[in-house]
Amino acid sequence: VPQRAGKYGLKVWHGAWLNDNDKENLEQINLLIDHANKYKDTVERVIVGNEVLLRKDLTANELRRYIRQVKQRVTQPVTYADVWEFWLRNPSLADEVDFITIHILPYWEDEPIGLDRREADGQLSIEKHLVDIYKKVQARFPDKKIVIGETGWPSDGRMRSDARPGRVEQVKYFSIFRGAAEREGFDYNVIEAFD
């Protein structure tokens, strides 16, 4: 990916997919380091693991070891990406990274939030949730840049509480999110995939 992205002037946040297999993790780490050093003009940020604490593939200490290995061998800013609450549960990991990457996925939260739900003051509940979570993490880690590494809404699937998946809902979610992001100055990625 970095080679092709560079050809078109695109920047990449390159990640290593970690799991509970040390051999596979070392292969991923070595590939990440190789690409980060080989494509310095394209690889803008480096992500060591995605939601491994959520999935319980690694402990925080095991993850810390991998982050340190990468930080010693690349020049780009290094982070770990997970659902926001896992950063709050493992705050010492912040000492290992250059910035905090959180995932805010209101449809997939333990308590899903529908797009049309409103607060008593009329504000959209989902917008309040996005801003509140961002600010909660920012307050916990005031000396770290906070990046939203994943946000989005599913186009299909089952209802979760009053959270309905769908293409129209995706557009609505992104419109709400983008408005909050512009007002609050979020640095973010949007999840988008295709078959």
Locations of regions flagged by a protein language model:
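Aromatic-lined carbohydrate-recognition surfaces of secreted/lumenal glycan-active proteins
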Residues: 16, 70-88, 143-150, 186-195
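Glycoside hydrolase catalytic-domain groove-lining segments
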Residues: 108-158
